[in-house]
Structures are given as structure tokens and as C-alpha cells.
């Protein structure tokens, strides 16, 4: 006689366990007990996000464990060792995702071998990658006259299309942020609605809470006490639960500034500043600017006064000449600056440039990636210190 009972694990996970007078046996006549739920969870916690994604298809038990609402407590996201880059290439109607380790002490002989994860068919009207945080990437595309935003997981290859925003609204800024306390992703969108033919318009802020497995996603309007113009193509950056992006106040006396959106409280703050490029510098908000002879790094120090510290680095002789190429500034967890182009030609070797600020040395590192077929010019997006995530499952 087989009995069924509910067993509660320490992780507040309820599983159905079968009790029988007979234990399971294999063909050799040996008997074995069923694997306890807590041991299953411990085994799963050792797997990578890519392997765990495959386990969802093994059986309903594994799928239910991985899809639990308290997934972040059962399987906390860990930074890989050594740190890795995630590369997302767009070309030929395909979206390719690769990862590679970050070199510990790069030199001219260093090379990064990218490991392929997924390639996803995307529409030809794909526009650009907007932002990335905590393992997820956000991009947008056009469907007729509507702009549609998509959240994409490069490791699992899954994506979710977000609800279409209000018609007749101009989208000024869009980004995804992460609340590390409540373990939640939120999407912020700033839109404006013009009145008649004049320059007057209403600015609106909307937030969407992105939760695993939730079907009825919707936008909520929130209040912001200050009116400003956003820098539409500025991607911004999320650091420790705060989303930073560039803007300009509508009041001429205030001028350029940085908007600080607290993902958890959904409150706005403002810093008067003209940021050429925002970076995450060792867990602090940074701003970097390249002049003819030097590189200027500004770091926002912690504290109520929000003071900026300034660091000037004279460019070494081996400084690369990008000759008008659109370059993205990145910073590794060790504080090394990394320069990479936003586009590249698959027929030409692709390089990243590491700049050691302390030793004032620039090293060129080749990235070996498979050629993307059918495309002569590829949109490139790189994220340092990447961590795996199982969201969108």
C-alpha cells in the first residue's frame, strides 16, 4: 500500500513524497532510497544556470523546485570565479550570446576564447540593446508604429516581450534595474506626451515589476517632482539598487544632471553633473572622460554630501587610436578600464583594450568569436563581471 504525504523542507518548499513498504530497486537487485528534497536542492545549487535550465525538462519535481517563488533563497546568484564577460552580437537577423573569462593579468599575447550559449532569431526591425543588469539584457524593436521592449536572458536564451506602452507617447528613456534587497527586477520608462503643435508636453514615469512566471505584467505610473529632458541614447547604469542615467533639467539654471532612481522605493534623486560616460567603479558611481592627452576619472564617494573625487591619468604611448569609432567604456571589478567598439566587422580581428590605471599600461586582447553569417557589420554589447541568472523561466 503506497501512501502520499506532504513534506516541508527547511527552505519552506512543499514536496510530495511516496512512502512504500518496498524500496526502489534496480535490475541488479540492489535497493536504494529516494533522494531527499533537501539533497536535490543542494545538488541543483551546484549547477550552472545553463545546466539548471535543462533540468526543468527532466521531470515535474525538478521543474517545480527551480520555478519556486523563493528561487533566490534556494539558489542564490553567485559571481563566477574567475569573472567573465558576456558578449551579445547582433547581425544577420540573429542575436548571438557568448561568455569568456576575464584575463587576470592581460598582456599582448592574451586572447579570450568565447563560449557560445544561444543564438536567437530576431526581427529585422530590431533597434538596439538598451541596458543590462544582473544577468538580463533589455533591447527594443519596432512593430508597425509601436515600440516594443524585450527582456532577454543570454544564458538560457529565453525572452519576454513587455506590454506595449500608451499610444502617442514619445519614449525618452528606458532601462531595467535590480533591487538586491527584495531580489526584484523593475523596468523604468520615461515618456512624454506633446500638446498640440507647441513645445509643451507632459512627462510621465512608469514602472513595471518583472517577476518570474508572472503572466499579467503591467505598467504603473509613479510621480517625479522634477521635469527634465533625458539623453535618449544614454544607457545608464544600475549600482547597488540605484539606476543612474543622464538628463538635463528644464530649468536653465540647473542644467545637466544625473537622475538617481531607487529601484526598491521607486523614489527619485538628482545630482548636478555633466556625465560624459557613467561607469561602475568598484561599486561606486563613476564618470570617465577621454581627452587628447589624458583620461579623467570622477568617482562619487559615499556620504550625504555626495562629493566627487577626481583622478587624472596621462595616456601612455601605446594608447589606441580609435579614429572616430564609437567606443564603450567598461570597468572590471578590479578597477581596470576596458575599451571596446560598439560595432565590429566579422572579417576583421576583434580586440578589447585593457587599461591598467595604476601601472598606466594599455594591453590589446583579441576576442575569438565565431563569425556571424550573413552580416558585414555587427552590433556589439559587452558586460564585464557577468553573473548567471535563471530569470525568465
Curated annotation (Swiss-Prot):
InterPro entries noted in UniProt: F-box-assoc_dom_typ3 (IPR013187), F-box-assoc_interact_dom (IPR017451), F-box-like_dom_sf (IPR036047), F-box_dom (IPR001810)
Pfam families: F-box, FBA_3
Highest taxon of the lineage: Eukaryota
Family matches, as PANTHER family: BNAA05G37150D PROTEIN-RELATED, E3 UBIQUITIN-PROTEIN LIGASE SGIP1
SUPFAM superfamilies from the UniProt entry: F-box domain
Coiled-coil annotated residue ranges, if any: none
Protein name, as recorded: Putative F-box protein At1g55070
Stored SMART domains: FBOX (SM00256)
Organism encoding this protein: Arabidopsis thaliana (Mouse-ear cress)
Classification via Gene3D superfamilies: 1.20.1280.50
Domain F-box: from-to ranges: 29-74
Amino acid at each position: 500500500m503506497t501512501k502520499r504525504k506532504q513534506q516541508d523542507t527547511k527552505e519552506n518548499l512543499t514536496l510530495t513524497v511516496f512512502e512504500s513498504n518496498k524500496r526502489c530497486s534496480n535490475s541488479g537487485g540492489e535497493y536504494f532510497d529516494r533522494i531527499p528534497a533537501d539533497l536535490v536542492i543542494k545538488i541543483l545549487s551546484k549547477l550552472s544556470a545553463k545546466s539548471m535550465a535543462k533540468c526543468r525538462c527532466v521531470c515535474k519535481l525538478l521543474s517545480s523546485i527551480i520555478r519556486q517563488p523563493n528561487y533566490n533563497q534556494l539558489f542564490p546568484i553567485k559571481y563566477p570565479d574567475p569573472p567573465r564577460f558576456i558578449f551579445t552580437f547582433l547581425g544577420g537577423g540573429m542575436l548571438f550570446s557568448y561568455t569568456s573569462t576575464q584575463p587576470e593579468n592581460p598582456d599582448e599575447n592574451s586572447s579570450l576564447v568565447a563560449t557560445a550559449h544561444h543564438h536567437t532569431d530576431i526581427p529585422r526591425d530590431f533597434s538596439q540593446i538598451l541596458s543590462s543588469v544582473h544577468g538580463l539584457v533589455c533591447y527594443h524593436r519596432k512593430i508597425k508604429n509601436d515600440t516594443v521592449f524585450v527582456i532577454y536572458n543570454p544564458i538560457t536564451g529565453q525572452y519576454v516581450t513587455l506590454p506595449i506602452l500608451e499610444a502617442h507617447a514619445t519614449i525618452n528613456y528606458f532601462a531595467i534595474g535590480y533591487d538586491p534587497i527584495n531580489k526584484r527586477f523593475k523596468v523604468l520608462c520615461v515618456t512624454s506626451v506633446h500638446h498640440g503643435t507647441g513645445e509643451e508636453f507632459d512627462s510621465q514615469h512608469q514602472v513595471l515589476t518583472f517577476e518570474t512566471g508572472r503572466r499579467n505584467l503591467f505598467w504603473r505610473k509613479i510621480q517625479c517632482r522634477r521635469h527634465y529632458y533625458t539623453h535618449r541614447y544614454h544607457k545608464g547604469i544600475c549600482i547597488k539598487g540605484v539606476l543612474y542615467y543622464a538628463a538635463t533639467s528644464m530649468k536653465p539654471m540647473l542644467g545637466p544632471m544625473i537622475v538617481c532612481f531607487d529601484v526598491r522605493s521607486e523614489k527619485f534623486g538628482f545630482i548636478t553633473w555633466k556625465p560624459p560616460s557613467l561607469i561602475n567603479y568598484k561599486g561606486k558611481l563613476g564618470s570617465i572622460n577621454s581627452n587628447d592627452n589624458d583620461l579623467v576619472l570622477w568617482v562619487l564617494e559615499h556620504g550625504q554630501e555626495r562629493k566627487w573625487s577626481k583622478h587624472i591619468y596621462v595616456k601612455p604611448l601605446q594608447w589606441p587610436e580609435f579614429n572616430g569609432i564609437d567606443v564603450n567604456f567598461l570597468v572590471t571589478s578590479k578597477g581596470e578600464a576596458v575599451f571596446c567598439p560598439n560595432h565590429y566587422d566579422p572579417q576583421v580581428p576583434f580586440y578589447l583594450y585593457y587599461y591598467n590605471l595604476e601601472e598606466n599600461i594599455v594591453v590589446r586582447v583579441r576576442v575569438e568569436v565565431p563569425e556571424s553569417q550573413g552580416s558585414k557589420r555587427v552590433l556589439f554589447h559587452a558586460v564585464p563581471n557577468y553573473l548567471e541568472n535563471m530569470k525568465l523561466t
